[in-house]
């Protein structure tokens, strides 16, 4: 149990470090042209309400990922549900579970940067600066590859099956749609 907790701490620190590095370029981001035409006063008085809605929405998708990993991906990769596995199988199940959450967390928390930086539809109507885009997608790429490396194995992660990425795409698209709805309600 203690070894697993120590590895989980390393996983969380690594996730936070890579995410923080991907955010370094935010001060050099583009601003939509309509914000440059005339000075605007920023009213942050209801920012708390926005955070109260956006924060828990992220947790909803974490829980969906947990359920996906526990009830679908884990049993399909390891051939059985968690409680029917031997000790070695349970350890592999935990490594797979952590890898799935690790990757999903990076994708959602990084892509939401692109969602909330503009009133427009990101990537279509408004694009982040090259440095922001480069660092955020590099962070996502690096973190997605870690479970497939020997380093990933050492910190308690294992490779994810291809079907995971189909589910991840659905989760990310739904999260981005919900973040867009919340953003539009806030901007009103």
For the regions a language model picked out, list residue spans one by one.
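Membrane-embedded transport module
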Residues: 1-121
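C-terminal transmembrane module of polytopic membrane proteins
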Residues: 16, 70-78, 98-188
């Amino acid at each position: 149990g203690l070894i697993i907790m120590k590895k989980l701490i390393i996983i969380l620190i690594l996730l936070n470090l890579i995410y923080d590095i991907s955010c370094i370029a935010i001060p050099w981001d583009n601003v939509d042209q309509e914000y440059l035409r005339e000075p605007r006063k920023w009213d942050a008085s209801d920012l708390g309400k926005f955070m109260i809605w956006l924060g828990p929405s992220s947790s909803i998708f974490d829980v969906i990922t947990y359920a996906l990993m526990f009830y679908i991906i884990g049993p399909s990769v390891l051939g059985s549900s968690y409680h029917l596995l031997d000790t070695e199988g349970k350890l592999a199940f935990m490594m797979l579970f952590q890898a799935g959450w690790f990757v999903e967390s990076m994708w959602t928390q990084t892509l939401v940067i692109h969602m909330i930086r503009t009133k427009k539809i990101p990537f279509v109507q408004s694009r982040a600066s090259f440095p922001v885009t480069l660092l955020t997608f590099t962070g996502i790429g690096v973190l997605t590859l870690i479970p497939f490396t020997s380093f990933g194995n050492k910190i308690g992660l294992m490779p994810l099956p291809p079907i995971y990425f189909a589910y991840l795409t659905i989760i990310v698209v739904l999260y981005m749609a919900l973040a867009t709805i919340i953003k539009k309600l806030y901007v009103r």
